[in-house]
């Protein structure tokens, strides 16, 4: 529960334990929940933090930015996780950070999927399935458009909007 002492939107679960690994790897894996952090740490993926089941906030992004400019979103493979990834991508980009996204199979999350694979196979899955934000959005949005020109146009506009929030003109 929220209180004057504890405000979930101001906390990244596991940050204290992960900060040295985030610096060492120059990358932060961002998950949704506590159990995801615990499972990934158990699998020796220690540069992992959670947004504590809340929508990602600018304050949380600033906390990560102190240690790395690279974030990989590992949200759940359900529609809610995909929607949260869409929202998070633009916020991370507008803070000037680099972002990639890993989508898990339908019905899986980092915790459940890490239990189905060996540690090495799970690490390989994370490496091989990281998509930059343009590829992530294009693949998902184009599946929805079904080659309808109006929907394709909306997809392109969505991607352009994401690019436009990048503060650095050269990166944009």
Enumerate the predicted regions with their spans.
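Generic hydrophobic alpha-helical scaffold/packing signal
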Residues: 19, 65, 89, 111, ...
